[in-house]
Amino acid sequence: PLGLLICFGRMSKNPAIRGIVSAYISVMRGTPLMLQLMVVYFGPYFIFGIRISMGYSLIAVFIAFSINYAAYFAEIYRGGIESISAGQYEAAKILGYSKAQTFFRIILPQVIKRILPSVTNEVITLVKDTSLAFVVAVSEMFTIAKQIASAQTTMMPFVIAAVFYFVFNLL
């Protein structure tokens, strides 16, 4: 949903909105996710002097992942919408459809069909990127596997984590 909203901002006829959203997308896609996690986690403290609570690390991970992946999804959605030929819009107008009806009944179903492979790839990448959450002290599966492996001097926790990531991405 956030990616679609950003997509509409990127496609806006208003140059100010389009420029701001384009800059946001460029920053999110042009900087590492790990850096974004650190900025979202440490930013409130260093910029505003707000104390970081114990539960904030998970919230920071959700915020950073949401704003990062929304930019990627926005570009996927934009590519899908712009790939629909002008004839589709013209046909809907001739049939008397409103702009909303045109989008939801004609354009969106075609867009979904076209973008589904790209969206699936991004979701797989998102699942794998969750291992970066350790940067802000969120114990996710890879961090726990690393702790167990170092305590037991065995590779099995890494193998189990790899199998889990692989199986989860098959779904």
Mark where each language-model region is.
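Transmembrane alpha-helices and adjacent helix-loop boundaries
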Residues: 1-171
